[in-house]
């Protein structure tokens, strides 16, 4: 073979290999969904409560957000990313999900999805009466405004295509039980047994996701309850002993609720053509972290990183609060909300389940 032919063949093979690598890379990085849409409470609120709302449940002040790239608080109740941001990143949609009430949203923000969640919200409207958050039942109204803007950008047909194929995260529930049943028993007269209140909440959840379906949503991840008896603030409020053991009867309530939710979601899916619903288990990963903290790099699971870690959250966790040096060693950032390290563990668990369900 002549030298010129050898060079030509080498260049051809090299070009082909590079093209194959580029194609493989594009296949790997291509988003599984065109957009991500978030509904719920403070576990997924990326900053809606920063904007004109008469609520004290805000996180636009230090030390919240201290481990974000710019080190600035932006409304996320953690030291860094929330679980919704982590999911969006793993799905190659975007790094951070902006709140819908943010006034300077770009068209690209709208095209790839936003957050409608509000810290302090719950499925029970009574929850937001005390927190002044945007009720979960009100969040579809924000979604309708989003759809209108999306249609203005890409037209009606393309907008509904994006909505139909978007990935939707719904995360709420703990506020309902803590505020209306455990700490302030306002619902106990109506529901003397916790199972009755659970059924009420699950019916509210079902009505909510059915409304989202009527607006075009098809792919939904629904979060279960965490081990509520292990939340630092809850252990403080129900103080039993100096060792701060989890409140097992409240954890059992979480388990029962989650079992009911896991049975409900397939029933909803079967009744809504073209829909896919996936249960997000946060209870078991969190219990594993509590029971075997060193496996996940944690040294503290019974209190938050901010202040004493027993009570501080929202306005009580502020610029004057001492903050732990190694946030990755704390399971909770404040007395309620997980640290970014915890959300990363949960995100790693959920990612293959999401791909398995929605790529099928």
From Swiss-Prot:
Q: In the UniProt record, does the keyword Magnesium occur?
A: no
Enzyme class, spelled out = hydrolase
Q: A single GO CC term, please?
A: extracellular region
Q: Where in the cell is it found?
A: Secreted
Where does the secretion signal sit in this chain? 1-27
Q: Supply one GO BP term.
A: lipid catabolic process
UniProt xrefs under Pfam families = Lipase_GDSL
Residues that carry a glycan? 26, 104, 326
Iron is among the record's keywords:
no
Task: Indicate the principal place this protein occupies in or around the cell.
Answer: secreted
- The organism sits in which domain of life? Eukaryota
Write the protein's name: GDSL esterase/lipase At2g31550
Sequence similarity? Belongs to the 'GDSL' lipolytic enzyme family.
**GO MF annotation: an example:** hydrolase activity, acting on ester bonds
Any idea which residues are catalytic in this one? 42 (nucleophile), 334, 337
Under Enzyme Commission nomenclature, its number is 3.1.1.-
Q: Which UniProt keywords apply?
A: Glycoprotein, Hydrolase, Lipid degradation, Lipid metabolism, Secreted, Signal
């Amino acid at each position: 073979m002549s030298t010129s032919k050898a060079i030509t063949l080498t260049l051809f093979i090299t070009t082909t290999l590079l093209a194959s690598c580029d194609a493989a890379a594009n296949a790997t990085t291509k988003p599984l969904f065109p957009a991500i849409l978030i509904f719920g409470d403070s576990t997924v609120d990326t900053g809606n409560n920063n904007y004109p709302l008469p609520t004290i449940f805000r996180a636009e002040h230090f030390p919240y957000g201290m481990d974000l790239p710019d080190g600035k608080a932006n409304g996320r109740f953690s030291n860094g990313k929330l679980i919704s941001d982590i999911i969006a990143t793993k799905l190659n949609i975007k790094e951070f999900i902006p709140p819908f009430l943010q006034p300077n949203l770009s068209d690209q923000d709208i095209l790839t999805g936003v957050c409608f969640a509000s810290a302090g919200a719950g499925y029970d409207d009574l929850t937001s009466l005390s927190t002044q958050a945007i009720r979960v039942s009100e969040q579809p109204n924000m979604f309708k405004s989003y759809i209108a803007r999306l249609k203005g950008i890409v037209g009606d047909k393309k907008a509904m295509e994006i909505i139909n194929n978007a990935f939707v995260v719904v995360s709420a529930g703990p506020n309902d039980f803590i505020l209306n049943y455990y700490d302030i028993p306002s619902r106990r007269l109506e529901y003397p047994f916790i199972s009755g209140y659970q059924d009420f909440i699950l019916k509210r959840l079902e009505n909510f996701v059915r409304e989202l379906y009527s607006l075009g949503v098809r792919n939904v991840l629904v979060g279960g309850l965490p081990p509520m008896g292990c939340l630092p603030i809850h252990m403080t409020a129900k103080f039993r002993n100096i060792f701060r053991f989890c409140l097992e009867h409240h954890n059992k309530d979480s388990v029962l609720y989650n079992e009911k939710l896991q049975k409900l979601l397939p029933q909803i899916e079967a009744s809504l053509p073209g829909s896919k619903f996936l249960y997000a288990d946060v209870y078991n990963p969190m219990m594993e972290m509590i029971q075997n903290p060193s496996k996940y790099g944690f040294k503290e699971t019974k209190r938050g990183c901010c202040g004493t870690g027993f009570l501080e959250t929202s306005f009580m966790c502020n610029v004057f609060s001492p903050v732990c040096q190694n946030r990755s060693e704390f399971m909770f950032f404040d007395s309620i909300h997980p640290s970014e390290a915890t959300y990363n563990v949960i995100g790693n668990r959920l990612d293959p389940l999401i791909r398995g369900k929605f790529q099928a």
